[in-house]
Swiss-Prot record:
Belongs to the formate--tetrahydrofolate ligase family. Its EC number is 6.3.4.3. It comes from Streptococcus pneumoniae (strain Taiwan19F-14). It comes from the Bacteria. This is Formate--tetrahydrofolate ligase. The gene is fhs. PROSITE patterns: FTHFS_1, FTHFS_2.
Length: 556
């Protein structure tokens, strides 16, 4: 079979104006970036707000292998299949970060015959949103350092500045840096560091803001650090929220592209799910719900991270809650969670599938806690065997969860028809009754304990001394009624990436709590989660090139 990039380059794209015409979007509603990419105008976004709200399908997954389990591929393929069976469907997914594209992933726009196009543009600079977020973030850093240099009227303690610079790359050498060196003319020396752009609070804000005014309000609420008297300093104190919003005025508008089969797709925003809330923008998802009968969206990593955050953080900002959750499972991930070594995942091992099913079962149970019906999608790989598939179907039947094999990577829309029909049937026969996991009025500790004990199935939460001090500060400042965004490894229910399967009765340690008032949540950091990833021994970048005619090579 052809590579992803070869498949993408073999497709004759339709002008984006033609793709979105069926949604009632005209040329005048678009801000074009060439023939095949566009942003949707705010006038059109506001015009469709009175339209009925369609059905929402959330795609999540079991705890993944390092290569991922094909959530984006399944999301795209399911939407194509829904359109194929006559359901007016849109996609709302995240934009890839260039760091992982150059690092381990090599691309993140779906795969095989379930891709959003033009995949080269989407994986690289796209419409410049990542650049705008990076620039806004670093403009704030420059303004903070300038304030220190110009006399520090606000009394900011440079030892307690929370705000870091960002770059959209995996670059471990930038995790800890010192700025302001070189004498009095070059600023005030202080410790600083870089995060990856998608970890920036501005990325989370962009994905939760509903319009320019809300964007400015959220930007003003960002806590950049503390004064010498330990009181918080915000962007509003610096009076620069207007300037930051100006940099982001186009980035906030959702991007429109198409799939191989011509399904319209919003690709907008891209926070990571292990260090942020892991969902595409509220604006894109909400607008899709007003334009289509079915919207298919995704949340990053496993359901313990992305789906929990989608349901506890993003859903309260949407006009509706998910009508169904599709949990993507692969036999290789089940075998890994069943104790098989990574180099043996392609070998038949029915017993390991049975052992690893405990992981999938827990995710199904967790989704049901939110009052939403679950459907299991087996993302088919060439190494899967009939015996393994039969065992998984039998196990799913034992817990009364619908399950379908999906071959959208190899077969495109046709390979997702059975899944699409099952999802539509599930929505019709099992109406969702959404409820949040916790009430925001609970204490910070109680909310974290609720997530750890009910979703992860841990027995106890330990708070390090630094975290205890920060909780007291959060309560003192009146921030304790915000939801919790857990920063945790994606590979395990616990904070130990090696504890695979369905561990129980473990303890989780909270080492730090970071207020993200602009985004509207408190980040609870566990384990060794990094906000600036590093590159692997052999980065995907080594396989990439561009020919003299501009043809891109090596994205996959």
């Amino acid at each position: 079979m052809k590579t992803d990039i070869e498949i993408a380059q073999s497709i004759e794209l339709k002008p984006i104006v033609d793709v979105v015409e069926k949604l009632g979007i005209s040329y005048d509603d678009l801000e074009l970036y060439g023939k095949y990419k566009a942003k949707l105008s705010f006038d059109k976004i506001r015009a469709v707000e009175s339209n009925p709200v369609g059905k929402l399908i959330l795609v999540t997954a079991i705890n993944p292998t390092p290569a991922g389990e094909g959530k984006s591929t399944l999301t795209i393929g399911l939407a194509d299949a829904l359109n194929k069976i006559g359901k007016k469907t849109m996609i709302a997914i995240r934009e890839p970060s260039l760091g992982p594209v150059m690092g381990i992933k090599g691309g993140a726009a779906g795969g095989g015959y379930a891709q959003v196009l033009p995949m080269e543009d989407i994986n690289l600079h796209f419409t410049g949103d990542m650049h705008a977020i990076t620039t806004a973030n670093n403009a704030l850093s420059a303004l903070i350092d300038n304030h220190l240099h110009q006399g520090n009227e606000l009394g900011i303690d440079q030892r307690r500045i929370l705000w870091k610079r960002v770059v959209d790359l995996n670059d471990r050498a930038l995790r800890h840096v010192t700025v302001g060196l070189g004498g009095p003319l070059n600023g005030i020396p202080r410790e600083d560091g870089f995060d990856i752009t998608v970890a920036s609070e501005i990325m989370a804000i962009l994905c939760l803001a509903t319009d320019i005014e809300d964007l400015k309000r959220r930007l003003a609420n960002i806590v950049i650090g503390y004064r010498y008297d330990r009181t918080p300093v915000s962007v509003g104190d610096l009076q620069v929220e207007g300037a930051l919003a100006l940099i982001l005025k186009d980035a906030i508008k959702p991007n429109l592209v198409q799939t191989i089969y011509g399904t319209p797709a919003f690709v907008h925003g891209g926070p990571f799910a292990n260090i942020a809330h892991g969902c595409n923008s509220v604006l894109a998802t909400t607008t899709a719900l007003h334009l289509a009968d079915y919207t298919v969206t995704e949340a990053g990593f496993g359901a313990d991270l992305g789906a929990e955050k989608f349901l506890d953080i993003k859903t309260p900002n949407l006009p509706t809650s998910p009508d169904a959750v599709v949990i993507v499972a692969t036999l290789r991930a089940l075998k890994m969670n069943g104790g098989v070594a990574k180099d043996a995942l392609t070998e038949e091992n029915v017993e390991a599938v049975r052992a690893g099913f405990a992981n999938l079962k827990r995710h199904v149970e967790n989704i049901r806690k939110f009052g939403i019906p679950a459907v299991v999608a087996i993302n088919e790989f060439v190494s899967d065997t009939e015996a393994e598939i039969a065992a998984l179907k039998e196990l799913c039947a034992s817990i009364d969860v619908p399950v379908e094999l999906a071959s959208v990577w190899a077969d495109g829309a046709e390979g997702g028809v059975a899944l699409a029909e099952t999802v539509v049937k599930t929505i019709a026969e099992n109406p969702a009754n959404y409820k949040r996991l916790y009430d925001n009025d609970l204490s910070v500790q109680e909310k974290i304990e609720k997530i750890v004990t009910e979703i992860y199935r841990g027995s106890k939460v330990n708070f390090e001394k630094k975290a205890q001090t920060q909780i007291a500060q959060i309560v003192q400042n009146g921030w304790d009624k915000l939801p919790i965004c857990m920063a945790k490894t994606q590979y395990s229910f616990s904070d130990n990436p090696n504890a695979l399967g369905a561990p129980e009765n473990f303890e989780i340690t909270i080492r730090e709590l970071v207020p993200k008032l602009g985004a509207g949540f408190i980040v609870a950091l566990t384990g060794d989660v990094m906000t600036m990833p590093g590159l692997p021994k052999r980065p995907a970048a080594l396989n990439m090139d561009v020919e003299s005619d501009g043809t891109v090579l090596g994205l996959f």
